[in-house]
Amino acid sequence: MQAIKLVVVGDGAVGKSCLLIAYTTNAFPGEYVPTVFDNYSANVMIDGKPFNLGLWDTAGQEDYDRLRPLSYPQTDVFLICFSIVSRASFENIRAKWYPEILHHAPNIPIVLVGTKNDLRGHHDLKRPEVSAAEANNLVRELGFSGYVETSALLQTNLRELFSLAIRTATSPKSASAKKKGGFFSSSSSSSSSSSSKSSEKSVPIPPVMPPAGKAPWIDIITSSYDKEMRETLNSESFSDVKFTFFEERPVYAHRVILCSASEFFRRVFGYTLSSDQAEFKLDDLNEGKVKNIRSVTIKPNEKNDDGTKSSGEFVEISIDSSINRRVFNRFIEFLYTGVLNYLDKNDQLQETIALAESVGFKYLASACKNVLGGNEDLNPSIGTFLNDQLGETSKELFFTKKILSDIQFIVEGRSIFAHKALIFSRSNVVNALIGRNFIEREGKVEMSDDVTFDSFMAILEYLYTAHAPIEEGDSVGILVLGNRFDLRRLVSLCELYISKEIERATTIGIFRSELDIIGLLICAQRHNAPQLEKFCLHFISSNYQPMRRRKEFALLDDKTKKHIEDNQWPPIHYLRAVEDYEKEMEKLKSSSKGWFKK
């Protein structure tokens, strides 16, 4: 089986790695991870002949201009890639990539590759595209072997590209051209062998670059929104609704949660969405005209039992005697958590279905039917949907609004209305924050001066919905405040987002990047973000040479510097081997007297 070495070059973030991964795995990678140097392999059949195709990925950033050419020896064919929606990457072919290959590996065939073809014609991107005609003109001008336009996302022309590359590498014309090449052509060993008869010198072999290792995986902590909502329900704290039953103990709940979860209760309490039916009239509720409800009593109430400010009213609802407490409490639990609580199939599930259908809550009926039909494994997806829906509806109805508010936060002199039931149970710190011992003035909590309004609003939105606007906000500020409030899942979300920002910000080059990665590492160390700390340590260590030249490097403590130096990539022994290799090459050039062509 003939072995073919194919090297891919081009600017950072044009899609080189995606091209190789999509070709070798038939799958598109979900996230961009800047390549240091990586290798892939594939066994393919072209024109009935088997080939072992060695695929060499390279880093396009200028930080690796010295090391990248060490991947070029014995190359059979190059792919120079540019993004069709990045004119700068196209212009760099003539300015950088072609001269680099011509210098280090003359006479090796080159195929020009346009990537991200799926973005062609997307006018909303507002980026100047490179036309196929321009690419073909460049092919003719520089003498490339051909041009192929591809999409790794859609698998467009991938097989055609690599088939062309293999045919180009194995064509008689290419073999003839390689024989004319310098040391870095694939036939350099035979060239040097013949030359050694007069020079008694052989071409030094470049040192093998050790792998850099993969970046640490950042795990997102699983949402516990349903468990937190159950804790809120069971605690009965801040409740402003009491459901009563004939000769059974009552069920306490919260209007803001019931309204966020159910159109039926929005109509009962009078806080409807534009898509809801009209609210029930109080007279109809008290005259038995609304199914399942006997009466509704509303009483003014300024204080909760613990002495803290209430939502202003306390509502008592008498439930019809045809509904037993267990079934009704299951309904309320399901509204809060999205989880169906039952012992077995005989645990009054039919009665629960009847109640759910009478109040128009189809999701509870579906969950019960799934259990009865042996499809209970479908219920977790219903719960996830309901948790998200509750959060989104609570945001629409109540977020920062005075309606039913029972607490205010003062941040940077601005007042923010909130609802204790919707933020309770998220963490012990949050619970302490809204408890009676912390509140300095009636129903108000004044945040410290170092808390910014925008970051606090992001935290509050997360407390309501289990989602935070990290992309639109200050992700670092949100992480710092999330750690202060002991919101570990939010911290993990910020860690992942910031890690992706690091990868995106360094596509132009690590030394030139405006992002302060060392500052992010120090922040992660100070604010209990261990996953981000490990990611930054790996990134700085894996890009040691450009990172150590940044002025922020001096801010690192001795322990951190030692860790980075001990784990630096490329390792010191490899860099020393590179220096020795370069010295040997210089000696060889000096002694070759003309037969070595630069």
Curated annotation (Swiss-Prot):
Family the entry assigns: In the N-terminal section; belongs to the small GTPase superfamily. Rho family.
Name recorded for this polypeptide: Rho-related protein racA
Biased composition (Low complexity): 182-197
Entry-linked Pfam families: BTB, Ras
Binding site for GTP: 11-17, 57-61, 115-118
UniProt cross-references to InterPro entries, sorted A to Z: BTB/POZ_dom, P-loop_NTPase, SKP1/BTB/POZ_sf, Small_GTP-bd, Small_GTPase, Small_GTPase_Rho
Keyword terms of this UniProt record: GTP-binding, Nucleotide-binding, Repeat
Domain spans labelled BTB: 239-344, 405-472
Domain of life: Eukaryota
Subunit architecture: Interacts with pakB.
Any one Gene Ontology BP term: regulation of cell shape
Assigned GO CC terms: cell projection; cytoplasmic vesicle; cytoskeleton; plasma membrane
Name of encoding gene: racA
Gene Ontology molecular-function annotations: GTP binding; GTPase activity; protein kinase binding
Motif (Effector region): 32-40
NCBIfam families the record matches: small_GTP
Region Disordered, residue ranges: 175-210
